[in-house]
């Protein structure tokens, strides 16, 4: 769970694929694997953690991103004894409760992970790559990053003015929620197709 959580907070303004390649190299190296254990991280010096995070470029901004990582380690240790599974268990695997806990009640304790785009996508990754099941998965909204917003605009679901507005992320979330309401489809399911479609330049399918 921590492997899919801590790097996610550094997943902004960078290539996601290279981030996870870096995370895997860091995990597979006995010298740097400790960064995925919050308690051990907090016992190390700042410089030791910084070195481990930058060795394979998990952290690109070595000062700021090491601070983010350590803040999260402190949060996970303080609130959940280093076991983030307890976060989901204590909130009954309820998407709304988890999101409110991170984005509203404890926003400062979850730097970047509390941001709208990253928080939704992180919960999706946990759902997709672990054994975690949410009781209301339909509440998990699309993760409105740049590519998803562009693809939503390309499909004509938002106007040019909406696409250029400061509130475009929330508009995209609301539009997909409205579209899939009372259907068998879940907004988060279309994140990857939209993201890949935009990232590849909206190529026509032959």
Predicted stretch roles:
Residues 1-206:
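HhH-family (HhH-GPD) DNA N-glycosylase catalytic core used in base-excision repair
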């Amino acid at each position: 769970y921590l492997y899919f959580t801590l790097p996610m907070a550094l997943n902004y303004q960078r290539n996601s694929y290279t981030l996870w390649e870096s995370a895997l190299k860091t995990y597979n190296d006995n010298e740097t694997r400790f960064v995925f254990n919050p308690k051990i991280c907090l016992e190390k010096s700042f410089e030791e953690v910084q070195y481990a995070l930058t060795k394979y470029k998990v952290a690109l901004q070595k000062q700021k991103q090491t601070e983010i990582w350590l803040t999260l380690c402190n949060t996970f240790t303080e609130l959940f004894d280093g076991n983030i599974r307890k976060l989901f268990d204590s909130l009954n695997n309820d998407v709304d409760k988890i999101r409110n806990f991170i984005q509203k009640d404890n926003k400062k304790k979850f730097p970047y992970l509390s941001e709208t785009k990253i928080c939704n996508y992180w919960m999706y990754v946990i759902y997709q790559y672990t054994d975690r099941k949410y009781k209301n998965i339909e509440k998990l909204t699309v993760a409105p990053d740049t590519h998803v917003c562009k693809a939503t605009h390309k499909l004509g679901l938002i106007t040019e003015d909406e696409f250029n507005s400061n509130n475009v992320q929330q508009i995209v979330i609301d539009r997909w929620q409205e579209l899939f309401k009372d259907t068998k489809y879940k907004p988060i399911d279309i994140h990857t197709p939209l993201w890949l479609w935009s990232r590849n330049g909206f190529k026509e399918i032959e």
